[in-house]
Amino acid sequence: MGGGDEGLQIVIFLHPPDSFTVYPTPTPNMPIDIEELRAFKGGDPEKVRESERRRFNDPSRVDTVIALDEQWRKCRGDADNLRKAKRLVSKQFQVYAKEKKDVAPLRAQAQEFTDKIAAKEKEMVDVAAQRDALLKQLGNFVHDSVPVFEHEEAPDGTLQNAIESKHGWETRRVFPDSKDQDKEELLKRNAAPGGGPDGAMLKHHQLLQRLGGYNPEAGARVGGSRCYFLKGAGVSLNYALQMYAQNFLVNQDYTLLQPPYFMRKDVMSGVAQLAEFDEALYHVGGGDETEKGEEREKYLIATSEQPICGFHMNEWIKEKDLMANPIKYAGVSTCFRKEAGSSGRDTRGIFRVHQFEKVEQFVICHPEKSWEQHEEMLMQCKTFTQSLGLSYRVVNIVSGDLNNAAAKKYDMEAWFPGYDDFREIVSIAFVVLGWLVVVGCGSWFTSIAILFSPCCFL
């Protein structure tokens, strides 16, 4: 850990800093620690390049980051040498004063060193910003068990995600042995408010409409596309399912945590990828008049994991405590998403909507317990889904569709008879962060594993 005693803000490192000189470096949230790229300190740049290849990213970015890091370290060395030279000049002041010599030349020399140090420190900050911006774009190490494909589906429509397990059954009464064009026609007919052809199964939103619990037309008039009203039985079902999920997780020693629904930009930038800012996040302008700068700029949360990442911001977690007891939260929140990249997709039904409720597992654990915890969370999701009587399958997501933070991700997909297809209901992402803007662990060498998954949502 690094920090200062003279009024300096504590900066949390999960690897020892190169020296105890405190530099004004940024602290973004990055899946890859810069130490992984420093071969002279035991890092393995080729391992990072290979992981980028698995993600179908350009591995040359790794070399650009290494070059910028070398430039930053040279700047730091130059700044240290200038400080040493300035200290020598400062010592000469005492000698000149005793001998009653003119100290004006020394003052000029000291000022020259001061100016050079300031310029070099500014260069350090600029280079670090460039380096860290690129470092943020590097993805976490892809786990060896992840299927290496660029997309979830091959050009011929074949699923490339690995199916890990299945539970229940698939009832295909809607489109038995039908051709694609027949299937498309039946989809259109089945979308009618009264249901589909004889023997067809109604979709979930059609059932809810028949119960008087769902009104998308009124929602669109009030909030625009992908908005809806829940009414009567729909509201009751929503809250009942949330409470059921909360009680389920509390019984598994999770602590309920309801976060604020918006976050400061500087905190959000530590937990969300830049692409999400435009595609997923709603920007909230204005802010409290007492707030200044970035504190006034906020974003609505897309998932409770974002604010929960900041719950322990600037706190110290002892390694032995984390080893003994992982921190387990059940995040309960409304979520807001722009779905900017979903134009024309899933326009009917309660899919890809702008607002929904979610109960989520969120675990901070020691890396040595991380994969064990990941599997435990998957088992919790299976048990929960089975308790609802749903059929599902678990798929291991391909490397090309993992976000930068995830080393591995499971999706649970429930069988939707009305759509004759599996649809995602749960994602369980595995994230190991070498250093974090949000939390530190009491050890020089320890990283932290953060795992999260929605337990349920409507």
What are these regions (language model features)?
Residues M1-D5:
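Intrinsically disordered, low-complexity regions enriched in glycine and serine
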Residues E6, V11, D18, V22, ...:
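Acidic, Ala/Val/Gly-enriched low-complexity intrinsically disordered segments
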Residues F13, F20-Y23, F430, F445, ...:
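Aromatic (phenylalanine/tyrosine) cluster motif
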Residues Y23-E184, K188:
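N-terminal alpha-helical targeting/anchoring segments
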Residues D58, G168-W435, G440-S443, A449, ...:
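TRNA-recognition modules of translation machinery and tRNA-sensing kinases, especially anticodon-binding
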Residues E164, I448-L451:
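Short stretches within intrinsically disordered, low-complexity N-terminal or propeptide regions
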